């Protein structure tokens, strides 16, 4: 159940994002376990994500980040445990009902051959077909493409785009869906610095308007810069959850990633840097 009363407000950009009090629980996972055969991928995971916050899932390869995101989205049924979305169990909800409450950006894009970029973004509006919200389809698509910096690619066939351009088109499609929970799996992996910042700035803006945002990131400095809380996963367990300053300590990061790391502050930013030997010392050895 949601732990706080909710109130209705209206997004200044798309009109629907901020329909919940920012501190109300959007997603709640309890005792989530996922096993594939004999292999346990997630073990006893508990996590709450609130409206109005960005939560970053970080951890080494194979830690269970993408699996947890899929469980939170309702795309993967856990072996045991429960996930609630705005107080309702995710399990058993119809796909359209889920799609009107949460949007998912998957790690591997499978955009259909032959579609133009704008057509792909318009697919995000399909869940609102034959509803009053459909009247704003063009407006919302225009906004999403501008925010994702893909307006100039509108008429390009998607397979002709670079990997980063395709990733931004997919992000625009997520924005066009215009829902209150955003689940992003490594949205910055194919992007240059400018567009990494742009995507996460928009994720932050969505949260500031009341959305709940969960984002899988490998870059810990990006996670520290843009998230309210960080959940550190390791071997299927959540090792720590808290503010970036609380959990991204050199001790924990070095242990989880099995590599010594520095964590320091620079002009108000928390930076995580792997410890490297100098080239001269490598040559001497």
Protein language model regions, located:
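Helix-to-loop junction immediately C-terminal to a conserved catalytic motif
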Residues: 73
């Amino acid at each position: 159940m949601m732990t706080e009363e909710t109130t209705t407000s209206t997004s200044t950009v798309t009109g629907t994002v901020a329909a919940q009090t920012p501190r109300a629980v959007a997603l709640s996972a309890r005792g989530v376990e996922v096993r594939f055969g004999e292999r346990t991928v997630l073990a006893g995971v508990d996590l709450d994500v609130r409206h109005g916050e960005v939560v970053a899932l970080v951890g080494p390869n194979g830690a269970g980040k993408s699996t947890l995101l899929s469980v939170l989205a309702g795309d993967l049924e856990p072996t045991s445990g429960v996930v609630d979305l705005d107080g309702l169990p995710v399990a058993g909800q119809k796909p359209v009902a889920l799609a009107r409450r949460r949007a998912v950006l998957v790690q591997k894009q499978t955009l259909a051959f032959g579609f133009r970029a704008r057509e792909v973004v318009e697919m995000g509006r399909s869940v609102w077909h034959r509803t009053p919200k459909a009247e704003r389809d063009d407006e919302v698509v225009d906004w999403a493409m501008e925010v994702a910096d893909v307006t100039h690619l509108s008429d390009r066939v998607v397979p002709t785009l670079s990997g980063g351009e395709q990733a931004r088109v997919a992000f625009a499609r997520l924005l066009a869906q215009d829902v209150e929970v955003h689940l992003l799996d490594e949205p910055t992996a194919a992007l240059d610095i400018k567009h990494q910042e742009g995507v996460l700035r928009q994720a932050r803006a969505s949260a500031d308007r009341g959305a709940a945002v969960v984002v899988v990131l490998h870059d810990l400095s990006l996670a520290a810069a843009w998230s309210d809380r960080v959940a550190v996963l390791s071997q299927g367990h959540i090792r720590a959850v808290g503010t970036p300053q609380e959990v991204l300590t050199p001790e924990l990061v070095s242990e989880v990633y099995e590599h010594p790391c520095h964590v320091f502050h620079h002009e108000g930013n928390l930076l995580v840097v792997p410890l490297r030997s100098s080239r001269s010392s490598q040559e001497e050895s």
